Amino acid sequence: NILGWDSVINLTELRDKCESYGITPVFITPTPLNPELIRKVKFIESPPYDWKEQRAYICDWMKQQKNCIDISEALSDSNGNLKAELATDGLHPDAEGKKIIGQAVEDWLNNYLTGGNTGE
C-alpha cells in the first residue's frame, strides 16, 4: 500500500513535469472504497485500516491545485465509503459510477473551455 504522502510526492513531480512542458495538469480525486464489498471478493486485498485518512490526504492536496475535479461527494455514502450501488466489488466503479465520473469531467471541461474555470 502506498501512503498518501508518497502519492502526493509523486503527483507533485508529475504536476511539475507537466507544467515544465506547457501541459496543464488536471487532477481528479481518487474514488472512495467500500471495504465491506471488497471483503466479499476473495481476490482483492482488503484496504489498510487508515485508507480514509490516506485518501483524504491525497484529496486535500488535489483540491489545492489549480485544476481539480472532485468526485468524492457524488460517489460517497454517508460514511465516506463508495456507495454500494456504484461498485459490485467495492473498488472499481460500475457503469453508473463511471457515468457519474464522466459527467463530472464533462461539466468541468465545458466550464473550463468556456472560460468559467481558468485554473487561476
Protein language model features and the residues they cover:
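Hydrophobic positions in alpha-helices of CheY-like receiver
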Residues: 14-18
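Substrate-gating cap/lid alpha-helix
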Residues: 11, 21, 32-73
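Structural beta-sheet core signal
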Residues: 27-29
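A short helix->loop->beta-strand "cap" motif at the edges of active sites that frequently abuts
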Residues: 19-25
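Short, flexible, mixed-charge acidic loops at enzyme active sites
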Residues: 76-84
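Histidine-centered active-site loop/cap adjacent to the catalytic His
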Residues: 56, 60-67, 84-120
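Solvent-exposed loop/turn segments at secondary-structure junctions
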Residues: 1-2, 31-35, 73-77, 91
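The substrate-binding groove and active-site-proximal loops of carbohydrate-active enzymes
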Residues: 1-6, 44-50, 89-92
